[in-house]
Regions:
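C-terminal binding/interaction regions
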Residues: 140-208
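Short, well-ordered loop/turn sites that connect or cap secondary structure elements
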Residues: 23-24
Length: 208
């Protein structure tokens, strides 16, 4: 579902395809509810090894991240820092991962490409980016770590299933229509760059 609060658009898990239909690339949103860290090795286990992911991420969100966790008593944990990792490393797995798990929101750093865009378009999900360099601030939005699965992978790769409140800001980089904010902007930026090079090179001959 979607909530509006103090001018913020907040996605609340579980998220449906209907919830995402009016969200466009470039929009700024926030996330409340279930968010599970899930990066390289977890993607490999699901896609290459065919293992069932032990956290139900269907209609929920994953975060490409390797957080810093503080162990507490009674098998409980505290989120210390949770900065995003580069999403492009998961590009080769993301289509099959989305198809298999039914995840609805993918949070990461930087853009993704054709396979992820196809998954967003076909299965009704989105990719969003959270600003890098704000890992401690992002951790404040984690209210509780509810589960920790695949602990054999070590702290960065463990599936940390968190309950978050207004996690963000998140910039929509791929929407559920498959439009890609980073790729579309590259075309526009390169066009402007070429135009400026032509103008400058007419005055400064050694450029071309």
């Amino acid at each position: 579902m979607i909530e509006m609060k103090d001018g913020k658009k907040i996605l609340v898990t579980p998220v449906s395809a209907e919830d995402l239909k009016d969200i466009k690339i470039g929009d700024i949103i926030y996330l409340s509810g279930s968010l599970t860290t899930c990066r390289d090795v977890a993607h490999r286990r699901v896609v290459e090894e065919g293992r069932e992911i032990p956290v139900d991420v269907r209609n929920n969100a994953i975060l490409h991240a390797g957080p810093i966790i503080r162990p507490l008593e009674n098998d409980r944990f505290e989120m210390v820092s949770v900065g995003p990792t580069t999403s492009m490393r998961m590009e080769k797995f993301e289509y099959e991962f989305v198809k298999t798990t039914g995840v609805r929101v993918i949070v990461g750093k930087g853009g993704m490409k054709e396979q992820t865009a196809a998954a967003c378009r076909e299965f009704g999900c989105i990719h969003v980016v959270i600003p890098a360099g704000c890992a401690v601030v992002a951790a404040v939005a984690v209210e509780e770590i509810e589960r920790a699965e695949w602990r054999d992978l070590g702290m960065p790769e463990t599936l940390w299933n968190c309950r978050v409140r207004e996690f963000g800001p998140l910039i929509v980089s791929i929407d559920s229509r498959g439009r890609n904010y980073f790729e579309e902007n590259k075309i526009e930026y390169n066009k402007k760059k070429d135009e400026q090079i032509e103008k400058i090179s007419a005055q400064v001959r050694f450029i071309k």
